[in-house]
């Protein structure tokens, strides 16, 4: 017995692409709080996975779309995101071009020796950087180090979204 199959084919309208819902993937979105920037933490304990590069590309893309972006660099040892942004600022100045720049804050680890004092110091440093950023920007991109640090774990508690780049 033959069963007729009917399919409705529609021509997509330019600029209206919407991905098909995938019921096998639980899709959640952190609720937007008016006047508070969305905090995206980019983390992976592995070094060289592309965290800083991903942070820069996401920030530039969001700024190109008109969003106000803040970036925080928690990798005091390497400071790759900070160096990327310093190079971008130097290029803008040298070439006289108008490119968007995020509000950027490097957040160094504590230099205190006593563990509980160092952890309290790092919490204060992170909050001092994050609180004004979430109030001033639409998005706050947090680049974490390629290691397990107290500062990195604290940043994860602030995340509205987590992104973990993988690189074999």
Regions found by a protein language model. Give the residues of each.
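Extreme N-terminal, non-catalytic leader segments
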Residues: 1-45
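P-loop/Walker-type NTP enzyme "switch/lid" segment
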Residues: 34, 39, 43-49, 63-139, ...
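Hydrophobic positions on the alpha1 helix immediately C-terminal to the Walker A/P-loop
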Residues: 53-54
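Active-site signature of alpha/beta-hydrolase-fold catalytic machinery across serine-
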Residues: 57, 61
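Conserved catalytic-core segment of NTP-binding enzymes
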Residues: 65, 70, 142-168
